[in-house]
Amino acid sequence: MGVGVAVAQGQLRPDISTLEAWQSAVLRASAIFYTHASSGRYIHGLLTSMGLWDKVRSKVQRFDNGEAMLLSLSQAGTPPGAMAMGAISEILTFAHRGVEWVGPLPSAIAHQTIYALALDLQSPRLGPAQACVHVCQQADVWGDVSRTGVEPL
């Protein structure tokens, strides 16, 4: 699951096509939203390691989760030029709900969080768990799932 950028509906979509363009967009943003979740920890690490943190610290707003972040971004009081960075799957669920998808982080800093399924062979619910794994292995399911920002490995 990748990390991407969003803006409030109707706002200018910043150029984030390269590392330099993303850095410039971050510096120009009026507000920067990200979460305390894994994607937000990654963004915070980027800002720190790239020497941007001291320049943007006053503009950063962190949220407990992607839903809270994106709801805030979509509100009427959000300053023009605000940008949110988070899990692509969360951003895409808010498309057409006051949030516009800008795109994934540029390839130089792209980040994927990998999730895996595992079965507990001692589980009293092993049958339903095996059925879930079976569904997840079906190629025809991934067309729908990919539209949510989740990609199979």
Where are these regions (language model features)?
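Exported/periplasmic ABC-transporter solute-binding proteins
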Residues: 1, 6-153
